[in-house]
Amino acid sequence: GYNIQMFSDVLQTELNANRNQAMRGDYHIPHTEEDYQRIDKTIAYKPETSWNYEAGAHLNLFDHMLHFDLSAFYMKVTNQQLSVMAGNYGFGRMMVNAGKSHSCGIEAALRGQLFDGKFDWAMSYGYTRSKFDKYVDGEGEDAVDYKGKYVPYVPQHTMAAMADYRLTDWLTLGANVNAQGKTYWDNANTYSQKMYAVLGAHVDLNFKAFNVSFWGRNLTDTNYNTFAVDNSATGTKEYFAQRGNPFQCGVDVRFHF
């Protein structure tokens, strides 16, 4: 593939380098075959390939009152595609290739019912270890070796749990929690989002003609980021992040026809 954003940076760099000549009138910027090869190398990225291995089991226990899923995986990736800040100016994003990386982990899930089917519950957990095996960014003295660093944007842990209890045919109470482990935002692992959890709850009223649901999300108003980048376009490294949703509450009404 080709990075449109990076090609824009190449054009901007050449225009700045030749602006004095261009201001005098029409001007053709000369290019050699080596120049075109260098540009192609700069803006192009290779396809990503991977070998994936997975083993797991699905169990129904206690007369289907309890369901248990367990799996383990291993993935070997070559030319892993990474989204990074683009070019000299740091605006926009582009795709680059890391040399090699691997990911391994486990996933487990439990779900079941109690009290004659009135109480539904579920919980899940996932662990992922994703690291670079070979990745050198840049050339010569400016080269940076990321071997052994965690692959960015991959949370190391994910957890979730929920429970719903039907008090009557028309009233249901429920709660849920979702958690995400440490997530690095850059290849060098210099900044990250620490583990956080988001709590939610709902009360459902079920009638023949309509349903009403009162709900709340992020009840503890947890402060967390869903995405972060750094930028050095001004000469000083700055960090920018997208905040996760704060406390929210609302009412949903659904009519049946």
Where are these regions (language model features)?
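Surface-exposed coil/turn segments at beta-strand junctions on protein surfaces, enriched
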Residues: 46-48, 61, 114, 154, ...
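Flexible, surface-exposed loop regions and adjacent strand-edge segments
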Residues: 4, 11-19, 84-94, 137-146, ...
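Membrane-embedded beta-barrel scaffold of Gram-negative outer-membrane proteins
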Residues: 1-6, 10-95, 102-104, 117-121, ...
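Residue-level recognition of strand-loop junctions within catalytic nucleotide-signaling folds
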Residues: 1, 60, 113, 208, ...
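Gram-negative outer-membrane beta-barrel transporters
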Residues: 65-78, 94-187, 254-256
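Residues that define the transmembrane beta-barrel architecture of outer-membrane proteins
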Residues: 49-53, 102-106, 149, 155-159, ...
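C-terminal beta-signal and adjacent terminal beta-strands/loops
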Residues: 76, 178-186, 204-257
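Outer-membrane beta-barrel proteins
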Residues: 41-45, 58, 94-98, 111, ...
